[in-house]
Amino acid sequence: MTLVIDASAVAAWLLPDAVGIDLAALASRHDIFTAPWLLWAEFRNILIVTERRGRLPLGMADQLIEAVDALGIVLDQTPSNAAVLALSRKHRLTVYDALYLELALRGGHDLATLDAKLADAAREEGLSVAR
């Protein structure tokens, strides 16, 4: 079973002061993690901002990137432009969040997110949301 995972879920699992989704538990129920290509940049941005704010020791970002890479998250490169825009309009989501929703819908996958608006949109579309 495949799980679409967003940057908020990954960050909450790995950052030392964050509380969130237990990806280890989700991994026992899902054999593949996937995300839009955007996750690559979003997660690194979260790390660098967290580091700048002093919440992450210098150098730890590199270790966390290695941990995420070890998850083997499959990055999707083929979103439907029309579907992403339609979902963004329908649910008043950013295009960034609509990318995650479109991928989950296209594959019929569950979605892991801590973003309340994205989770609500996924539920409205009939998807299961891990929080």
Model-derived regions, located:
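Active-site-adjacent beta-strand anchor residues
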Residues: W13, F33-W37, Q77, T94, ...
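Short amphipathic alpha-helical interaction patches enriched in hydrophobic/aromatic residues
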Residues: L47-E51, G72, G108
